[in-house]
């Protein structure tokens, strides 16, 4: 009976196509979710596919291809004559249509199926559709849309309502500007008594500090109307004074009635003083007021204040990375971890190995991946530009390193090995096949990364079965050494030392190498490797020798220091015998309830220098609630801006309000390890991350970058929050809410309007407002007080010309009210409906 239903749907589609107007405007692929069957973790969905090409799609010759992080078709529910294939990864899917599925141009095919898995967000659903026509050997990329709001069972998703958000924002209220910070991250000490001076043109001197005068002049001038000069023929009204009592990055900034003074011991401190001054002057101009007469004494809490940008999953070019560096410098971050490779992309040009970027730098339709990688994360057929394609040239990388150095930022190259290496493996396999075809086996095997005879079986965290390098062949180490040395050469061209090299090494699945003939021989002939379980540690020591030989220090994710076992991401045991490697772990996997919340403290207490990269606090792609329209992931929980801001790096258990919300009691906390006072020096700092699986446009990238980067900078630089010293959740909550309200106001009223004017601007997040109607009165709130809220009563989506919400207003109970947040430029966010 069920199959008859689906066959009838197919028959119906043919009847529908006869009525379809050839000129009707339509989105080629409509994916309609008919039912969310939450109890059974299934969905009933309907595909509507329109041939929008000028060529007939003859049955038996065409197939539909797409990616979807969640959702796998239940084969038994497919219409007869339709074949489903899961290819690999997370996820590349294909439907091949049999002989009776003939679609002329503008014809439409409609059929229904069931899927395993509930799509938690649109960004994790189907995307990147294209049709491959095997007869014409062409691909047609198809625009798509997901329709879901009228699905049965939608109430089971617990989607946040306008009223829910209104409650979430209940502790937020608009503050007067004299209660707001002039500088973020908040300086260690500041004295402002409410007095102002008149603005004036600036003429500064650097008094011998090794900073490029034109660079400071240009940077300080950005966004300002006053003139900035450094002219010895004029009187100086901004003086820089050397103060050797200050630490390297510390500074004093004093704005007086007639002059400005900066004190520092090193150029880094001078630079950060100018960044603080820049913020103050920009805010003063935006608010059309004088300059505050203020004294600031400032120094960072942590030496390492990092941001990692993933350009491997989805690629963003040099120009975007330079803009990121500008914003990092503004907020006093000093380490840029550039993730250049992963399973889904190789993004750095390497001389002598063109396959890395020709194959590994592109995704799209392929029969054997000798020309490019399979589509992933909505990259489409590859015949059009997409964020799945692209790479940095060597010169691009040199310019990035130089640009960063000028802004007191160190660039750290991240080249994943031996895990998350699928792009490199496939590229070198293409090289192998090409040279083998012409009989040059020496060249074919020189940089080989796979064992063709390996029968090992595994699935990585992203569901790949072939993303781990065969580390039992000299060719693998020859390859990695070449990469290290070629990247070192780029640093030399940038006149900058390569101090650190990141091997990644996260999420190594259990199972590789166990059935590899190469590895069996390698272990049998090497007394330093007793068993296959010892192979990975031996590999790490070889990598360390290569990296230290290049004058750098080896760093990577903490996974490399944990026992490689069937426990995989649940493993807790530390490999203390690797302490002599001087390896710095970036400790990321601390999901609440996962058992590794205290891992960084355990590592530091054992003597490892470590950096906190907490997924439950500092991953910008973690969404904040169940909203279907959010971009990002939630595997490490739902993380709000307030959660990130409220994280105490030296003791993640100190925020009692957060523990209470998570249901974590004191007995559970008592089982965890805390950072010992004598190990505090091993805690080097913190790093934020932006992974790009769901980031398919610059707009999405910007919305996840900002204001996350600003919030993170507060934790990286500013002092510990005073409310954390209070003993209980009950005591902490009012103080926490008050402090967050002050910070959120500083974001909404000052920082977000300011960054709109800097470095080309950024489309920062505009959170959905919250609202209720109580006794015919509309009440609205927003996450960042100071941003505008506009509304309509006629059912139309609000624009920048719509009425501005300023106070509660009377509304008709029968009206459908649309509400939307706006920034200072008039750009609007997503709208909500209040009934």
Regions found by a protein language model. Give the residues of each.
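Flexible, acidic glycine-rich loops studded with aromatic residues
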Residues: 554-771
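Short acidic, flexible loop segments centered on an aromatic residue
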Residues: 37, 54-87, 128-130
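Active-site neighborhood of glycoside hydrolase catalytic domains
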Residues: 460-583, 589-595, 600-602
